[in-house]
Amino acid sequence: MLNLKRGIGTHEPSVISLGQVWVDIMLNVDKVPAQGGFAVADHPKPSIGGSYRVLQAASRMGVPTEHAGILGNGLWAHFIRQSFQDNGITHIGQDRLDEDSGFRVVLSSGAPQKTFIASYGAEAHGDSDTFDTLEPQPKDVVHISGNTLMDHTATGVDGFLLKAGTDPAARDYTLVINPTNTLRLVNDHMLEDLVLARPVWSCNRQEAMTLAERLGAPIDDSKVTIGGG
């Protein structure tokens, strides 16, 4: 793998994502076929998914944005890199030369729930040293998404959390966790290290309830207030 290093000579506070980025391929079908069936999809539309949306939103607000996750080498990775370039997002993470980035096929039939088929790629195949070279600078915001907490790359996130320590006042950057709906699948060890890091938790109501249940915290629904969710 190759690493890209951050220049810190004249640093401007940035949003840094440790999350995974992949390509979503949206397929609209009349009905999701049963096993052995057949369906015709209208207007297939590839787009960038995962933590890309957070980076894109921050960039549109005029904030420098950096992706510290892994990108691969191939068709999908090229699509991601081009989207980064078009949206002012800098990739500072590892480059995996022997594997493409992954993709998700998303089947939508008009039903409330979509059907997902995932092909994991370079983004999911990190290890304990994936984020070793990342050194957040003063006033940076480091964003960790739930999609990075369940596969090989999670060991790298865990290493970063241990380096971040347990006292937010001792850090000169802000650590934000967006657990997504995968929080119920995160293993106990990882959840413990997330909690001990004392980050800012960015949750909707369902995610906040799941977190409370995982931690064994009492829930009084009448007193639960979730801003924006």
Predicted regions and their residues:
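Short acidic/glycine-enriched loop/turn segments that link adjacent beta-strands
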Residues: 99-102
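Ribokinase/PfkB-type carbohydrate-kinase core domain
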Residues: 2-21, 82-96, 108-229
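Glycine-rich phosphate/adenosyl-contacting loop at the front of the ribokinase-like
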Residues: 1-70, 75-79
